Amino acid sequence: FTIEDENTDVAKLLENLPLEKVVIYFKLGFLSIDFVMKIDAIAKAKNATIYCNLDPIGQLAKEGNWFKTKKKNNFETLNKLASTTANISLISIDGGLYQNAGANMVQQIAYALSHANEYFNRITTINKPIVFEVSVGTNYFFEIAKLRALRLLFNLVAKEYNHDLDCHLPV
């Protein structure tokens, strides 16, 4: 689900879905502690697997501006959310942004990994997988190699920060 407005009633949106059987992905067009806490409460109550896909760096790269928050600091907000939400995954990296901007496969991997590196630097508590949204082109075997390389290199970067997280690649 893509949600652009904080006023969306997420409980009503999810009430008739079999949340214990499906994985839910939200792409939020804003950064709100209260909204994400509601999603976390739903995930806990219904034993759901939910990914919020928050990507402030991707927002900056795409729009030229950070998410608007009350304190005007996206990383402080993400740090607070990461330390208080235990039932959902928060962080996402939009690698498709770089492919659509004309990057080749090596550049896409490099930019996505530098993106992840910055999140590891700025967010103190990352305990859930990071979602990588990756665009694929028509060169089938090279795209498979790109995904394998991304997974392998991400594990190397995560190991440097003493994380044993795997990247999550929804394909």
Each language-model region and where it sits:
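Conserved helix-loop functional segments at active or binding sites
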Residues: 121-126, 156-164
